[in-house]
């Protein structure tokens, strides 16, 4: 049975462009037309409009206000912490792959009193300099020479930053949740946005020490419940890679990420959180060979995604080798069965949309 696309269009517009701002065209709809659907009138069908609206980014003015809200929270914390904390951003807002209901913007406060350090990786790299450039060798040696053990207690520092931030934010904003393990939730009222404040320490990876490229710096988030730091993440590298690959793909990568997020959100069989998160959708889309879709019309991107999900479901070897955008973990290593159930639901949604496109093409042909 065909979906109620008018209702779906209404919902996706409400969550991505609540202020009804005039939106610009996507790169993938400025070409002459779809290779699969040569009749241009198909683009005015309800199913095509739903696809287009689901691929578009959130209105720029709305996204800008999300950043303004994060800046306001940062200003309060900066006044309290001074120069002892650096501030960064992570999340899908920084790549413009967010949808309104998953308006993912994290304010990361990072202690600069200490950092984690990949000592073993550094020594291993310096013992095999034949594969390194001269500049990389010099950078590694400099990091080794400049290293000195931290005399304080890193966990105590992070605990103090977290506690002080809880006090500052609770006295500034009406709605604050300090019970979350990895972050402090803050509801900013003007502009009205939800902000998560994460407390972390830097992690100096070998790639960072070789290049001094800030995007190669990792972070380890302080967990309030365990009183420990979590495994290393590379959010800044993920942001850079998605932004760069989107340019290489002629702006199509982000179209696919947003589309799959919206399809997941509209799927009645998948919970809002679920096993497949933004993290996994980013990785799935990022993994697709750019050459397969870099010049395609937006309607053809649906088939590309369907083929990818089908391959993930049927080919274990292929599935097991899909890594996160930062390249640090295999996304189907854990909870694979649950994730595959949701991938199957997403695949069915795409199959249904493709069938409706073909049926509509016959009607207007």
Swiss-Prot record:
Its EC number is 2.7.7.65. It is an enzyme of class 2 (transferase). The lineage of its organism: Bacteria, Pseudomonadati, Bacteroidota, Flavobacteriia, Flavobacteriales. Keywords: Antiviral defense, GTP-binding, Nucleotide-binding, Nucleotidyltransferase, Transferase. Cyclic nucleotide synthase (second messenger synthase) of a CBASS antivirus system. CBASS (cyclic oligonucleotide-based antiphage signaling system) provides immunity against bacteriophage. The CD-NTase protein synthesizes cyclic nucleotides in response to infection; these serve as specific second messenger signals. The signals activate a diverse range of effectors, leading to bacterial cell death and thus abortive phage infection. A type I-D(GG) CBASS system. Cyclic dinucleotide synthase that catalyzes the synthesis of c-di-GMP, has no activity with other NTP substrates. This is c-di-GMP synthase. GO terms for biological process: defense response to virus. Belongs to the CD-NTase family. E subfamily. Bacteria with this enzyme do not have other c-di-GMP synthase enzymes (no GGDEF or EAL-domain containing proteins), suggesting this second messenger has been co-opted for CBASS signaling via STING activation. GO terms for molecular function: diguanylate cyclase activity; GTP binding. It comes from Flavobacteriaceae sp. genome_bin_11. It catalyses: 2 GTP = 3',3'-c-di-GMP + 2 diphosphate.
